[in-house]
Every structure is written in structure tokens, then in C-alpha cells.
Amino acid sequence: MSRKRVDLLLENMMIESCAAEGKALTHWNGIVVFVPFAVPGDIVDIRVIKKSKNYYEGRIERIVEPSKDRLEPFCEHFGTCGGCKWQPLPYQLQLDAKRKQVEDQLVRIGHLEVPEIRPTIPSDQIRYYRNKLEFTFSSRRWLMKDEDPE
């Protein structure tokens, strides 16, 4: 499935739900649009940066109206390191999204019949508990979010 670079701005889009990999989603003209760092209920302007046959990927250009559930990220590295993609989401909503993701992957993607999936067991520690790092290597310089790659 090939991806094409596009430059499309979708304005005043309501974020509908959480998706896999810490992203959220909305729909535009029947196409699913995945957006990192968004919270269900946010109204945002989205810059579409990649387009594939069945979905678009975008980034938040502007938060028009934040969701009532949106939290201020607590980590100074939020949005850069990739470790805590759901920081703006309250912890209970993170747990609910993770349970829904498991169910979705088993039922919708795996075509399995499963019993009711119990709630995700919460951690006593809800900050600084991650033990995963994501490293990216390249022979090219790292670009920050506000830099133009062209």
C-alpha cells in the first residue's frame, strides 16, 4: 500500500475516539484520519501529512477547542520522545482505550468471538512508569515539529 505526501488542512474536526499506538481518530468524507496527541472531544485543525488508500495520517495544526477531558502533559519531553503518547488523556480513559483496542483487534481484525473483556488492571503509579524507549536512527538530521522538511 503506497503512501502519498499531501498538504491538506482539515478545519474544525471533532476527534471521535482513541485508536492504536496512542493516536486518535476522526473521519473526513468517509476517510479515517489518524492524529497523534489528540483527545476525544477535541476540535482541531489537522494538517494531513500522509495519504494512503484507506486512511490519512495528520498532525494537529491548531486546537480550536480542547476536549473537557484534555489534560496538560506533565513531562517536558512529551511529543518528542514517543514514550507517553496518551499524556493528555486522563488515566481511566487510557485504560478504557487499551481495553477497547484489545477487543477491536480480536473481534474486528482477528474475526474472533470473545467473551466480555474485563477492565484493564490499573497501575498504582500513573506517572513515570514507562519502561519503553523508542529510538530512531538516520543518516540525516532530526527535524523538530515546527521545521519544514522540504
Where are these regions (language model features)?
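SAM-dependent transferase fold signal centered on methyltransferase-like domains
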Residues: 1-150
